[in-house]
Design a protein with these regions (language model features):
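Active-site-proximal helix-loop elements at catalytic-domain edges
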Residues: 1-26
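A short glycine/serine-rich beta->alpha loop
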Residues: 5-13, 40-49, 98-103
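Mg2+-dependent prenyl diphosphate-binding active-site environment of isoprenoid biosynthetic enzymes
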Residues: 16, 59-62, 104, 108-111
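Acidic-glycine-rich active-site phosphate/pyrophosphate-binding loop
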Residues: 22-40, 88-91
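Short glycine/serine- and small hydrophobic-enriched flexible loop segments
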Residues: 23-27, 59-66, 115-119
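Phosphate-handling active-site elements
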Residues: 28-37, 62-79
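Glycine/serine-rich anion-binding loops at beta->alpha junctions
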Residues: 41-63
Length: 122
């Protein structure tokens, strides 16, 4: 049996930060969120804004807890809020360029975001 990969392992293999979180979620939970939905989100949407790893975690939470149609309640917001709050509590920001300025490595935030996602969904 092979050892379970960390989200950052996928990052080191060439996926961007957001794609890596989604790939790890798919592998652990047997889902099939298309990786391509996150292809433009790495590097803070390529301009240093919302961290791609955090964004990827929010995509997974929305997939797991989101609504399917107009008029339905939207519980996904509760979960994405938890992800955002935990990240801000820990790092003081969710902004990619600020995280990098503070020398937070992408591998670190990818694994952190994935763990926060799993904790939020419990």
């Amino acid at each position: 049996m092979s050892e379970k990969k960390l989200a950052s392992d996928y990052f080191m293999e060439g996926l961007n930060c957001a794609e890596s979180v989604i790939k790890a979620y798919n592998e652990e939970f047997g889902t099939d969120i298309p990786i391509r939905v996150a292809s433009g989100l790495g590097g803070g949407c390529a301009v240093g804004n919302l961290c791609g790893a955090v964004n990827g975690a929010c995509i997974c939470a929305s997939f797991a807890k989101g609504r399917d149609d107009i008029g339905q309640e939207n519980p996904a917001k509760t979960y994405t809020k938890k992800i955002m709050q935990k990240t801000i509590e820990h790092y003081g920001t969710t902004e990619c360029k600020s995280l990098k300025k503070d020398r937070v490595g992408c591998k670190e935030i990818v694994d952190f975001s994935y763990e926060v996602l799993k904790e939020a969904l419990k």
